[in-house]
Amino acid sequence: MKPILPLLLRRSLLASLLVPIISLSFSASAADFMVDASQYSDPNNNIYSTLEELVSSVALVAGDTVILNNDDASLTTGLTVPVNFRSADPAALCAVDLSGLGKNPLYNLGAGEYTLEMDSVIWSNGAAGVIRTADDNVSLEITGEVQFLNNHVDNSNNSAYGGAIDMEGDHATLTLGNNATFSRNYAFSSSNYSSSSSSGGAIAMSGDYTTVTLEDNATFSGNYTFSDSTSHLSNYPSTSFGGAIYMEGDHATLTLGSNATFSGNYTFSKSGTYSTATTATSSGGAIYMRGDHAMLTLGD
């Protein structure tokens, strides 16, 4: 029998889970918060006019669910705890514009196990991607019909990875449910004084024994990587890999469910002087996997 904790104790325990002991799992909702621009904020009833007002209130704890009644472009602060998001009407997608976050992602997750609901939500215009991890042993499952639109990483210091999602570390796992959509996300890197590289316009995974699983009807369109190491003075190499998905490391596994669609994804590189481009490499317009014993499985 699954033990049931009192609400107060349960919320206290969830709030303390930023320090992992064995694993972190946030699949259960602790409380619901509503974002509704048509209403005045009423914190006592968990109602907020904007998403930024809710995040700034520090009322959210790990496992809470944010219910969106409308599009929102208010965020200037990234999330410090992993919470769920869903549209109040599953038939009406709600778009969250992340441009106000600047060079910060929405989620920056540490080691642990996460299950996040993102149902009928569009994440758009993030300038540092949407989700980033940099630890070993991170497991992230995203449920619901989620879209990633026009997100990017723009790095003028040699390299850029994962326009929407970037996971760096061994034994990292990413799973997305049915109908996940990635459109017009990109990774761009430039340098006039050294080599540059960009990898994974939509998704980048770096590390050994990493796994990406996309369930049925995944769509990748118009995602790209672009590297530019053009210089007035000399030739510097420029590389660009995986317009949609990039995986680097031994024993990497990519599994795509039925009816996955890739269209208009590409890679592009420029290098050398403005009159020559002899050391530019672009590979994997849709998918690029690099490492020993890599495995790609395609559905019907």
Features from the language model and the residues they span:
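Sec/Tat signal peptide C-region and signal peptidase I cleavage site
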Residues: 26-30
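Extracellular beta-strand/beta-solenoid scaffold signature
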Residues: 98-109, 124-135, 147-169, 184-206, ...
